[in-house]
């Protein structure tokens, strides 16, 4: 029997079967996809083959994971060589960002975007809590939106509290399985409650001491839109503190920064790393202001990930 994983509680997986029934399943101990060292062998969005519970008390279990169309993956933790898969078989991803309380850095944004580019997952940036922004915050919001829209990433300015911008965001999610990700405290749960009122997710507060969010979502789950096309759903994920990249070779990192990759076609050397080489068209474009300095800094930070000891958790 086949189905789709719609919830991961850590010890069990809720699978929606092709006949519409939902079953909690265990994962076989040797269940791993070839070539992936993951802390979670099964991810929400995975298409799986399951064996139902037997009459002799054997619980239902996941026998096989079907090949993934794509996924979003990150380094599991500091100095770790293992990965954590946030979601699989995605049509899109929404990265929820905030200018303040907590701050979403451009390095964090760009690491997420580069990973999504690597696995061909289109990303929408949703800047939340705009009802709380000061004039200075608004200026920063406009600066960031200008950078990312110029590259080709849609930017939505939204408020889960007032509802501003939500219709535009929701229209981009119609007919899609969309991963929702971001730091703890950026308002992911509040945003889902505003987009899908029946979701009724628990929301949390910001730590005033550290200006960071406190986890309210502890497991990943798929939530259907009742008022959009069939197949429209969000995957809610726990807050991410840092985003370490994986599986990116030194000479391919630039491929996942569209504006850097476009400029690199003019480089003198085919193996240019865009850091110091003579005749580097990327460095020239950077000097002319055609590439944002923040994006280039993020590019350099991913190059450093080859040395795991230099991974910095604030990303």
Curated annotation (Swiss-Prot):
EC number(s) given by UniProt: 3.6.1.-
Listed GO biological process terms: ribosomal small subunit biogenesis
Matching Pfam families: RsgA_GTPase (PF03193), RsgA_N (PF16745)
UniProt keyword RNA-binding, yes or no: yes
Source species, domain of life: Bacteria
Cofactor: how bound: Binds 1 zinc ion per subunit.
Cofactor field: Zn(2+)
Positions contributing to GTP binding: 128-131, 182-190
One cellular component (GO) term of this entry: cytoplasm
Keywords: Cytoplasm, GTP-binding, Hydrolase, Metal-binding, Nucleotide-binding, Ribosome biogenesis, RNA-binding, rRNA-binding, Zinc
Keyword Cell membrane: no
PANTHER family according to UniProt: SMALL RIBOSOMAL SUBUNIT BIOGENESIS GTPASE RSGA, SMALL RIBOSOMAL SUBUNIT BIOGENESIS GTPASE RSGA 1, MITOCHONDRIAL-RELATED
Complexes and interactors: Monomer. Associates with 30S ribosomal subunit, binds 16S rRNA.
Family label: Belongs to the TRAFAC class YlqF/YawG GTPase family. RsgA subfamily.
Function statement: One of several proteins that assist in the late maturation steps of the functional core of the 30S ribosomal subunit. Helps release RbfA from mature subunits. May play a role in the assembly of ribosomal proteins into the subunit. Circularly permuted GTPase that catalyzes slow GTP hydrolysis, GTPase activity is stimulated by the 30S ribosomal subunit.
Listed name of the protein: Small ribosomal subunit biogenesis GTPase RsgA
Organism expressing this protein natively: Porphyromonas gingivalis (strain ATCC 33277 / DSM 20709 / CIP 103683 / JCM 12257 / NCTC 11834 / 2561)
């Amino acid at each position: 029997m086949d189905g789709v994983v719609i919830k991961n509680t850590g010890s069990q997986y809720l699978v929606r079967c092709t006949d519409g029934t939902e079953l909690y399943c265990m994962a076989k101990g040797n269940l791993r996809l070839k070539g992936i060292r993951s802390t979670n062998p099964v991810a929400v969005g995975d298409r799986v083959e399951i064996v139902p519970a037997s009459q002799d008390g054997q619980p239902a279990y996941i026998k096989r994971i079907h090949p993934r169309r794509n996924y979003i993956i990150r380094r599991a933790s500091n100095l770790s060589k293992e990965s954590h898969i946030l979601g699989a078989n995605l049509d899109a991803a929404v990265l929820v960002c905030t200018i303040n309380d907590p701050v979403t850095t451009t390095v964090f944004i760009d690491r997420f975007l580069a990973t999504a580019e690597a696995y061909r997952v289109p990303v929408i940036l949703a800047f939340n809590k705009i009802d709380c922004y000061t004039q200075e915050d608004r200026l920063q919001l406009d600066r960031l939106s200008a950078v990312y829209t110029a590259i080709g990433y849609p930017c939505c300015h939204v408020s889960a509290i007032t509802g501003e911008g939500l219709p535009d965001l929701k229209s981009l999610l119609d007919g899609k399985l969309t991963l929702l990700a971001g730091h703890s405290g950026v308002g992911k749960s509040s945003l889902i409650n505003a987009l899908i009122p029946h979701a009724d997710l628990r929301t949390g507060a910001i730590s005033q001491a550290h200006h960071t969010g406190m986890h309210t979502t502890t497991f990943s789950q798929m939530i259907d839109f009742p008022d959009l096309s069939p197949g429209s759903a969000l995957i809610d994920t726990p807050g991410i503190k840092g985003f370490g990249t994986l599986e990116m070779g030194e000479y391919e990192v630039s491929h996942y920064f569209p504006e850097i990759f476009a400029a690199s076609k003019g480089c003198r050397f085919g193996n240019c790393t865009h850091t110091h080489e003579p005749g580097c068209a990327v460095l020239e474009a950077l000097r002319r202001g055609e590439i944002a300095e923040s994006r280039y800094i993020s590019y350099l930070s991913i190059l450093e990930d080859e040395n795991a000891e230099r991974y910095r958790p604030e990303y």
